[in-house]
C-alpha cells in the first residue's frame, strides 16, 4: 500500500510545499479509540490546517446551513439510494486541498451514521486538474479513514503529468481488482468531487455516463466492468432503476444501449428510467456557446426511446434532475418527451 514515507517523498519531489508532509508525519490514529478512524483523521485535518473558517465560508455560501446538515439533508432528501454527490470546490480560489479531503471524509461519515444503514460500497471518482499531484495524499487519508485503498480503472486515460511509477503499478492489474469498499480514478478536469455510491444492499439505480468535460471518458469496457462488478456484489436477481447520463458529444450511447439490452434480456432492469443530456463547463462563455449545440441527435433520441419504451419516467424526475445539477449555473435547459421517456438537456457552468 501507499505509505506515509512514499507520499512525503513524492510531495518533496514535486515541490508542492511541506504542509502535507508535516501533516502526515503528525497523523496519529488509535485503533483502540472509541472514536472512529474516520473521525480521528477528520479532526486532525481540521486542527492541523485550521479548516474552521473555510467550512464556515462554505456554509455561508449555502444559506448558512451547517456542513453536516448540508450533507445529511442532501442525502436524506434524495429519493434514490444511489447518490451522485457533487461538491463545488474552488481549488483555485478559496478552498484548499485539505478541505476537500475533509469533505470526502465527512460525506462518508455522514452516510455511515445515517439511519438507512449506509454506506456499504463506494465507487469514488476524484476529478480535478489540481488533485493529480495530491492523489496519493488523498488516497492515504481515505485509507486511514475506512481501511481500503482507491484503485483506478485500468482503462482510465490519465494525463501524463499525473502518472507516477507507483500509480502506474496500480492500474496495470485487472480493473477493480480491489474488492474493498473504495475504488476510483484520478483524472484532470473542472472543480468538483463526484461520488457514485453503489450500495450493495439497498441500491435501486446505477449511473452511467461519460465525463468528457473532465478528460475522463468511461469506455464501453469500463462500463461493462462496472455493471458486472455491481451485479457480482448485489446478485443478479436484484433489479435496478436506470439513469443514463450522456453529454452533447456522446458517441458511445449506442454501444451502451447494446450492453443494456443484454441486461434487459437477463431481466435485470426495473421499469423506471431517467435520461439527462448535459454539458457543464468551467466558464460562462463556453456554456453559452454550448447552448447552441443540439444535444442528443433526433435519431439517437429515437434509439433511446425505442429501447426504453416499456419503461416510465417517475413523477418526481424533474425534482431529481434539479438535485443532480445542484447549484450549477444553467444557461440553457430543455426537456422533451419521446413516448414515455423524459429527456433533460442542460448546458451550464461552474462558477
Swiss-Prot record:
Coiled coil: none annotated. One of its GO terms (biological process) is glycolytic process. InterPro entries: PpPFK_gamma_sf. One of its GO terms (cellular component) is cytoplasm. Disruption phenotype: Decreased growth on nutrient limitation and reduced cell flocculation compared to wild-type. It holds the Pfam family PpPFK_gamma-like_C. It is found in: Cytoplasm. Pathway: Carbohydrate degradation; glycolysis; D-glyceraldehyde 3-phosphate and glycerone phosphate from D-glucose: step 3/4. Keywords: Cytoplasm, Glycolysis. Structural subunit of pyrophosphate--fructose 6-phosphate 1-phosphotransferase. Not required for catalytic activity. Fine-tunes allosteric regulation of the ATP-PFK by ATP, fructose 2,6-bisphosphate and AMP. Heterododecamer of 4 alpha, 4 beta and 4 gamma chains. The gamma chain bridges the N-terminal halves of the alpha and beta subunits. This subunit is only found in some Pichia species. This is ATP-dependent 6-phosphofructokinase subunit gamma. It comes from Komagataella phaffii (strain GS115 / ATCC 20864).
Amino acid at each position: 500500500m501507499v505509505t506515509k514515507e512514499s507520499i512525503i517523498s513524492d510531495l518533496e519531489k514535486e515541490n508542492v510545499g511541506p504542509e502535507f508532509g508535516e501533516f502526515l508525519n503528525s497523523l496519529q490514529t488509535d485503533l483502540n479509540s472509541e472514536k472512529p478512524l474516520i473521525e480521528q483523521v477528520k479532526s486532525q485535518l481540521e486542527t492541523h490546517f485550521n479548516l474552521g473558517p473555510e467550512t464556515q465560508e462554505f456554509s455561508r455560501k449555502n444559506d448558512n446551513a451547517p456542513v453536516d446538515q448540508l450533507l445529511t439533508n442532501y442525502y436524506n432528501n434524495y429519493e434514490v439510494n444511489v447518490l451522485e454527490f457533487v461538491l463545488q470546490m474552488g481549488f483555485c480560489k478559496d478552498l484548499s486541498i485539505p478541505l476537500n479531503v475533509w469533505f470526502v471524509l465527512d460525506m462518508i461519515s455522514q452516510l455511515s451514521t445515517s439511519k438507512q444503514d449506509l454506506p456499504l460500497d463506494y465507487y469514488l471518482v476524484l476529478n480535478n486538474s489540481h488533485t493529480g499531484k495530491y492523489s496519493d495524499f488523498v488516497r492515504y487519508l481515505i485509507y486511514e479513514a475506512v481501511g481500503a485503498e482507491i484503485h483506478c480503472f485500468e482503462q482510465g486515460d490519465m494525463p501524463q503529468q499525473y502518472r507516477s511509477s507507483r500509480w502506474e503499478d496500480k492500474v496495470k492489474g485487472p480493473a477493480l481488482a480491489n474488492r474493498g469498499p473504495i475504488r476510483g480514478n484520478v483524472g484532470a478536469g473542472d472543480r468538483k468531487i463526484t461520488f457514485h455510491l453503489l450500495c450493495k444492499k439497498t441500491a435501486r439505480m446505477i449511473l452511467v455516463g461519460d465525463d468528457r468535460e473532465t478528460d475522463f471518458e468511461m469506455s464501453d469496457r469500463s462500463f461493462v466492468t462496472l455493471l458486472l462488478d455491481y451485479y457480482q456484489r448485489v446478485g443478479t436477481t436484484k433489479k435496478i432503476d436506470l439513469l443514463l447520463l450522456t453529454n452533447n458529444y456522446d458517441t458511445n450511447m449506442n454501444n451502451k444501449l447494446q450492453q443494456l439490452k443484454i441486461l434487459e434480456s437477463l431481466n435485470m432492469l426495473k421499469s423506471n428510467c431517467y435520461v439527462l443530456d448535459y454539458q457543464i463547463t468551467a466558464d460562462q462563455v463556453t456554456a453559452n456557446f454550448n447552448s447552441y449545440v443540439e444535444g442528443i441527435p433526433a435519431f439517437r433520441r429515437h434509439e433511446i426511446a425505442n429501447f426504453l419504451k416499456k419503461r416510465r419516467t417517475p413523477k418526481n424526475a424533474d425534482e431529481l434532475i434539479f438535485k443532480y445539477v445542484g447549484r450549477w449555473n444553467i444557461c440553457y435547459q430543455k426537456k422533451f418527451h419521446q413516448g414515455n421517456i423524459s429527456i433533460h438537456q442542460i448546458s451550464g457552468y461552474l462558477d
